[in-house]
């Protein structure tokens, strides 16, 4: 039987001893595997991923200094001895072990309780990549976004999507903001490279950097989806709610007469990396946050940055899209039991939309691996409707989704992981 976070904290020293023994036994038989190409050699390497339609990477962050403080005893606990023991156990204990970086494998160490005492179940999970707590943002970006050629795909008229998924407090926003700023840094350089190749392919002379960069037109929108309500993060407003968050006009999310899902958002024409950086910073400053049990500044919403790319050299070509999504955190009942009514409803809607998203991702991966028709239920939720470009099986545009799944490092969260 799985244990609660409070009960896990009470027996933390026992779990730590079990975990140490597991690590010792495993190290004797199975060494930890790293990445196939060292980070220092990554940019010079010709190795590319198989470029599947759906690529999944795990990431776990290092624990913050206050790691254990979040799991001190429950003040409402009836057993005073249990609370006292929990409060004394302030040392961090990891619930995640990455055993292979590429292909990615990690073990979740799930606490349990039997008549004989505390137990740990070591459950393995596999993905394309796995990033441990010692891997920095630049390496994550290079091994995910760059290695999967997502920028080139979008510049070539396809759809590239990067999603940060995970439990509240697991580090999604930290990762996605770093990805957004690195995309802003690299996108225009990549556009000039692709533009030069296009000019040569059309029989033209070697184009200058300016001429190659002018081939593409970039328009940017930034949408926030909070529960069932969508708003425009680029809308300026001075009105705030009781929590100090800005109040914005509700945006409708629906298909138009020809089947496109294009909310009526402010679209900004961007010409340089600096302009894109400024826009990202402006939008992120408008995003709604609130304090939760797990995070003092938790992002309670899904945030979708969409960069539409028009090729002026080939005006009849499909418009490419780059969609960067920082998803709201998934929450267990234990994490949300202290929320007010509004936050409870938001958490419920967020969990439902994340479940719908998982169904769509699984169906898309299954469609790529098997022959025959596979239904992708993207109309089931506003979030998946906004991601129609990567889920619509009738679309002629190539698409690729990179999912960075964040796993909390705390053993108290292993059940959720």
Label each region the model flagged.
Residues 63, 408-411:
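Acidic glycine-/aspartate-rich tracts in secreted/extracellular proteins
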Residues 2-36, 102-104, 108-400, 414-417:
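P-loop NTPase motor catalytic core
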Residues 1-114:
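Long, basic/Gly/Ser/Thr-rich N-terminal segments
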Residues 399-408:
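Extended, charged alpha-helical "arm/stalk" segments used for dimerization and assembly
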């Amino acid at each position: 039987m799985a244990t609660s976070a409070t009960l896990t904290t009470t027996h933390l020293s026992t779990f730590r001893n079990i975990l140490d023994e597991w690590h010792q036994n495993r190290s004797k038989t199975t060494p930890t595997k790293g990445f196939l190409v060292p980070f220092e050699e990554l940019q010079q390497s010709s190795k590319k991923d198989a470029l599947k339609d759906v690529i999944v990477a795990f990431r776990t962050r290092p624990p913050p200094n206050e790691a254990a403080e979040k799991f001190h005893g429950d003040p409402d606990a009836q057993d005073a001895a249990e609370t006292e023991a929990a409060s004394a156990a302030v040392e961090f204990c990891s619930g995640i072990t990455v055993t292979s970086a590429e292909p990615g494998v990690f073990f979740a160490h799930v606490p349990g309780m039997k008549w004989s005492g505390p137990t740990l179940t070591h459950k393995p999970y596999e993905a394309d990549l796995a990033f441990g707590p010692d891997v920095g943002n630049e390496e994550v970006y290079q091994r995910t976004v760059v290695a999967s050629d997502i920028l080139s795909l979008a510049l070539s008229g396809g759809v590239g999507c990067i999603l940060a998924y995970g439990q509240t407090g697991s580090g999604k926003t930290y990762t996605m903001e770093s990805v957004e700023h690195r995309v802003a840094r690299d996108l225009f350089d990549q556009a000039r490279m692709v533009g030069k190749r296009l000019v040569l392919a059309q029989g033209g002379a070697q184009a200058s950097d300016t001429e190659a960069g002018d081939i593409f037109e970039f328009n940017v929108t930034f949408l926030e989806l909070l529960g069932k309500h969508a708003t425009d993060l680029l809308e300026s407003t001075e009105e705030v709610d009781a929590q100090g968050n800005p109040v914005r006009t509700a945006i409708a999310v629906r298909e138009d007469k020809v089947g496109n899902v294009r909310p009526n958002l402010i679209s900004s024409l961007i010409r340089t990396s600096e302009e894109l950086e400024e826009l990202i910073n402006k939008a992120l400053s408008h995003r709604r946050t609130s304090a939760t049990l797990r995070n003092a500044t938790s992002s309670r919403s899904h945030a979708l940055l969409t960069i539409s790319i028009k090729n002026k050299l080939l005006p009849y070509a499909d418009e490419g899209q780059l969609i960067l999504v920082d998803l709201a955190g998934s929450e267990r009942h234990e994490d949300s039991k202290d929320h007010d009514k509004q936050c409870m409803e938001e958490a419920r809607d967020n969990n439902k939309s994340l479940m719908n998203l998982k169904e769509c991702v699984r169906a898309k991966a299954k469609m790529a691996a098997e022959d025959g028709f596979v239904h992708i239920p993207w109309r089931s939720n506003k979030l998946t409707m906004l991601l129609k470009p990567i889920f619509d099986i009738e679309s002629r545009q190539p698409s690729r989704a990179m999912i960075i799944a964040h796993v909390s490092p705390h053993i108290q969260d292993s059940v959720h992981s």
